[in-house]
Amino acid sequence: AQSVFEVDCMGLLNIAKTLNSGKDLAGNDLDEPTNFYIGATGNPGAPDLEIERQKLAAKIKNGAHFVQTQPIYDLEQAKRYIDKMSEFDVPIMLGLIPLKSFKMATYLHEKVPGINLTQEILDRVEKGGKEAGTEIAIETLEQIKKIAAGVHIMPLNDIDTTLHIINHV
């Protein structure tokens, strides 16, 4: 089987925006407009934040109401991203994945574009495993509260740890 990509992210945003305006994709009036709250992605770890800013401008033009980012572990990087995107009147929710192991942390850092773990975090998770990863998530969430509109936690099937993090904060 082959994947079929008939619509890219900008096209999908535009479709939702069009439906919210009360039109279908052929331009016909809908009985009622939809009321989608349209989200888009952002990447604080992008190598060029100016290009990322231009992408976000296009996403907002095409209907995005809010942004959810890649997971962040470098708060200075997150602050630079928030500052660079401050011209836009959309809430930015920073992503957070609680680290379960050193293997997971290393994989995210080395293999997933836009996810950058500091050496301090890698060292802590190497020594303390999942417990250290949970502590880092709590500390990171405390800082996110100060700089962003919110956070979206990606629990990766570990609801108990996520609840522990939320209850701590």
Q: Which residue ranges define each predicted feature?
A:
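C-terminal helical cap(s) of enzyme catalytic domains, especially alpha/beta-barrels
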Residues: 1, 5, 12-13, 78-82, ...
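Active-site pocket-lining/capping segments in soluble small-molecule metabolic enzymes
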Residues: 3-31, 41-46, 87-140, 157
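Active-site glycine-rich loop that binds ribose-phosphate moieties when present
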Residues: 24-27, 47-62
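Flavin-dependent oxidoreductase catalytic cores
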Residues: 36, 124-127, 168
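A short secondary-structure junction signal
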Residues: 49-55, 71, 79-81
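Conserved, mostly hydrophobic/aromatic
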Residues: 59, 63, 94, 151
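Non-catalytic positions within long, well-ordered alpha-helices that form the structural scaffold/packing
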Residues: 60, 144-145
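Catalytic beta/alpha-barrel core
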Residues: 65-74, 150-155
